[in-house]
Amino acid sequence: ETIGILNILLGSEWNISLRPIFKASMELLNVPAEKQDELLGQVEEFFTLRLKNIFLDREVPHHVIDLLLSNNELSVADAEGLVNALLANRIDENVELVQAYTRMYNLVKDVEYTGVNSDLLKEDAEKVLFEAATKASEASSAAWEAGDYDAVVAVPATLVPAINKFFEDVM
């Protein structure tokens, strides 16, 4: 039945979160409040694994599936839209993009994000990267709100020149 529900959602235009439905079902079934969070996690994990199997049957690469399904806030429709956009654009095969983001990840992987104080940016390349990242964030948010998954997937590539310039000039 789970795969049937997921297939209905994948084939529809419905972009809904299943979490409120799961919570309402637990209330109707009189699940004790102290057990609801644990049960909710188990049900969501069960649905996520079934969705993963559907994507694997469609030969979506494991790393693409793992990336998407690591965000438990995604609806089935969002996951489907992003899978299609990622497969159409294959940003994971863009060597320059992967290298730039790997360098950035290695720089910040042990840092806890607390925000950016733009007054501390001294080098032009830092300022350019911050401005580009701010615009990219806005573009990504607007594309996400519009349901334009291709545009969401295209945003990271727009930062590559600023990332590369940052590493050339600052690092």
For each of these PLM feature ranges, what is it?
Residues 1-171:
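Amphipathic alpha-helical "coupling" segments that flank catalytic cores
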